[in-house]
From Swiss-Prot:
Catalytic residues (UniProt): 246 (nucleophile)
Native source organism of the sequence: Aliivibrio fischeri (strain ATCC 700601 / ES114)
Gene designation per UniProt: rsmF
Record carries keyword Cytoplasm: yes
Record-linked SUPFAM superfamilies: S-adenosyl-L-methionine-dependent methyltransferases
Residues binding S-adenosyl-L-methionine, per UniProt: 124-130, 148, 175, 193
Annotated protein name in UniProt: Ribosomal RNA small subunit methyltransferase F
Length: 473
């Protein structure tokens, strides 16, 4: 129990005023004091839910389904006191993502009756839980622009995208307010998981409310209004967007959605979410939003609204200052050479939805759907880095292997547990078998990296920033 949790009187008064009468304040406070259940989402870009369930059963992990996400589970592990969830082999290989159950709901809402997404925007995407969930829902097809304003969070976003084998994402690093003017009516689907006061995160962080005040709620509401307007301008006619927060007050939730109607009138339709999952009606508002208090589903507090754009809007006028784009499409000759080398050395091919782009000695695989947007905005990175050229051919990159390779590849070298631990510590390994050339390294049937045979050892190709120590699986 979080008996020392800080709940300001003004916050409790606000909850008392706005919480539906059928919910109890005593149950709300009791729920806030209970530690949050650990939850994960299976990464179906790497393994199916059934395959993961089999792995979990072998490790005696108990999985309880999350009702609103087919790939989400609350998890209980016998070794939780000795091995952190993030240090399990399955997590490090990208087979699952540690994600709070409530935060899976916005992407579920965005994907409902919306299977054929060609161009999506995740406007505030770090650390990447919803970006990777959306990419998986898109089956790595189309294009997904993942934006993050905070410089310190871009690196972890990039790392999570690579670990999960996502290949259809372009990263941007802007204040989300620029999208409405820079890319008007561009995206058929938009997720705005807005920065907020975080009232719903109390169970995860007992100190979450120490900096809370009614004034801070009003202040952040101004930012949210700007962001939702920008997102609506960037949304195509007929497109859908989801607005979500991990907070509980009406100022940052219902009022922000109603502001959109005040600005754009009949162009805005709220799509009801009462049938999103069984028992969703327990959190349903009169507008059709989901307002999740922590005691309803024993989860974090959350808010989710789904909005459709019925008519065009006039975006703000902007002047773009873009430098020269440093990449060029690979020529047919270059592309054929890259494809042939990738096939002959590693028995791999890039997906049909990607194409080669060149920057100096670097070879990248961009989502084809990004091509019309390349001259419209500045990007932190697009797609994944496939290789670096050198005089003897190509030096394939770790992130490309994580995006492309599967454990049934004929070049794979399967490690035992001790060797896999050595691998993640950045050390070369000496299996009791031999090989030659570059090899895809696997552990328990999951791809974990790229190595190269040097004599009777495999030279470790793990990027330095991924090297781990401590108690691993």
């Amino acid at each position: 129990m979080h008996d020392n949790i800080f709940l300001p009187d003004a916050f409790l008064a606000q909850v008392q005023e706005t919480m539906p009468s059928y919910l109890s304040m005593d149950e709300f406070i009791a729920a806030c004091k209970r530690p949050l259940r650990r939850s994960i989402r299976v990464n179906i870009l790497k393994n199916s839910v059934e395959e993961f369930k089999q792995r979990a059963a072998e490790k005696q992990w108990d999985l309880e389904p999350v009702p609103w996400c087919d790939t989400g589970f609350w998890i209980t592990r016998p070794e939780s006191d000795t091995v952190k969830l993030g240090s399990t082999a399955e997590h490090m290989a990208g087979l699952f993502y540690i994600q709070e159950a409530s935060s899976m709901m916005p992407v579920t809402a965005l994907l409902k009756d919306n299977d054929d997404i060609e161009m999506a925007l995740d406007m505030a995407s770090a650390p990447g839980s919803k970006t990777t969930q959306l990419a998986a829902g898109m089956k790595n097809q189309g294009a997904l622009v993942a934006n993050e304003f905070s410089s310190s969070r871009v690196k972890v976003l990039c790392s999570n995208i690579q670990r999960c084998g996502v290949s259809n994402v372009a990263l941007t690093h802007f204040d989300g307010r620029v999208f409405g003017g820079w890319l008007p009516e561009t995206f058929d689907s938009i997720l705005l998981d807005a920065p907020c006061s975080g009232e719903g995160t109390i169970r995860k962080d007992p100190d979450a409310m120490h900096n809370w005040s009614p004034e801070s709620v009003i202040e952040i509401g101004d930012t949210q209004r700007d962001l939702i307007e920008s997102a609506f301008h960037a949304l195509k006619l007929g497109g859908v967007m989801v607005y979500s927060t991990c907070t509980l007050n009406h100022e940052e939730n219902q009022n922000i959605c109603h502001h959109l109607v005040e600005q754009f009138g009949d162009a805005v339709t709220f799509e009801p979410l009462g049938d999103l999952f069984e028992s969703a009606e327990k959190a349903l508002t009169k507008e059709g939003f989901l307002h999740i208090y922590p005691q309803i589903f024993d989860s974090e507090g959350f808010f989710v609204a789904k909005i459709r754009k019925n008519s065009s809007t006039t975006p703000p006028e902007v002047k773009k200052r873009l430098g020269k784009f440093p990449f060029a499409p690979a020529s047919n000759k270059e592309a054929q050479a890259i494809e042939a080398e990738l096939k002959s050395t590693l028995q791999l091919a890039i997906p049909e939805d990607n194409e080669f782009w060149i920057r100096d000695k670097e070879v990248w695989a961009f989502p084809k759907r990004m091509k019309p947007l390349i001259g419209e905005m500045r990007y932190h990175r697009i797609g994944f880095k496939l290789a670096e050229t050198h005089k003897k051919g190509y030096r394939w990159q770790h992130e490309a292997i994580m995006a492309l390779a599967t454990a049934d590849n004929p070049t794979c070298a399967e490690l035992n547990t001790e060797q896999a631990r050595e691998w993640y510590m950045g050390r070369d390994v000496r299996p009791d078998f031999s090989g030659k050339g570059e090899t895809i390294v696997t552990y328990k049937g999951a791809v974990i990296g790229l190595g190269k045979w040097v004599g009777n050892r495999i030279k470790n190709g793990l990027p330095r920033e991924l090297v781990r120590d401590g108690n691993l699986f």
